[in-house]
Amino acid sequence: MIRILVFSFVVMVGGCTTLQPDPVRNISHTIPPASSGALAETADKLRLPPGVTAAMPLSAAQEALDWRLALVDHAITSIDIQYFIWSSDEAGILLFDRLMQAADRGVRVRLLVDDLALDGSDHNIAVYSRHPNFEIRIYNPGRVRKSALGGIGEFMLYFRALNRRMHNKLFVVDNRFAILGGRNIGNPYFGLSKKYNNRDMDLLLAGAIVPEISQAFDKYWNAELAYPGGAMSPSASIEELPERRKVLEMYLEQHSETLSSYPMQRQDWKNLFKLLPQRVDIGKGHFLQDIPVSHDGRELKLVDMIDQIAGESHEELILVSPYFIPTEGLLESIAEQVSRGVKVKILTGSLGSNNHTAVHSHYRKYRRKILAAGAELYEFRHDPSEHIRAISD
């Protein structure tokens, strides 16, 4: 009772608006893999046996954005996207505009974004969601909107519930191709920021693993914490959509210099697709994802699933994570793997390459334990170009 009274006071003092608590959620599910179109043809040319997955690393920033644009430009049935961050900058607007164009062609687009770093007004999100083929959902939004004071107050009162964030990052098109990895959507993830850029890696995937990824997306999309974008502002109207689309077009025109390496309109990417069969690695793939946490706190920890997969490794286990803080259970699993002759390698960020010093400070406490478990531990340099220059000199 006291918490409710305090929350009401914060709302009044902050001059806040609040979200309706229980909006209508339409349940939807993944569409079967497309049987025609450029993406289906490209996937079929890989000639993958049943149960097999093809994977290609996307380490270069421009290539990572190229492939996202290429998949969207050739989509014919569905696009399912899930990200922690989607920024309203050049990269974010370029890709968002292409998604709108795909929806115009009749492609069903579902976009799920976490609320914590949401970059866009509630009203605009609702307007975009009025498109008949385009729906946005916001993961675990705070009820208090348009007020920093109110938002902080709500977070303090309901920390446990609002601290449950969605860091997942996936991009599935026509249920034939998927992109997974460390990149969110924004300039720093694609080498376009004038301040700093992140070094990330994605995997382009085709084959047996893609329907698994789509089914995992459905669990988040239909979860009780996924809030319908159309309900973010009930007054939003589809009549506002053309004007919002013009704003996107004007933004892209004004920032064309930053985006000079990318086509501003849909184009044919078949020359890019032709190179794929020679570049992919073929094998068995596992997709791991924690389940969406419900309000009652039920959850399945990703580290437990990693332990399970690690137990199946026979020769080598490689873990790559910018933020690596192992549990005791994972350390025991690593030691057990090493004792059976499995080579375990771990790559994480150094202090200089990490954008969260608090996380790195906590990780440092585990260095000796990781090495004692028998793993090879590597930290990514913040200045790899300097090292390369020293070698070439």
Q: Model segments located where?
A:
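Charged, low-complexity intrinsically disordered terminal segments
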Residues: 16-169, 173-393
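Bacterial N-terminal signal peptides
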Residues: 4-14
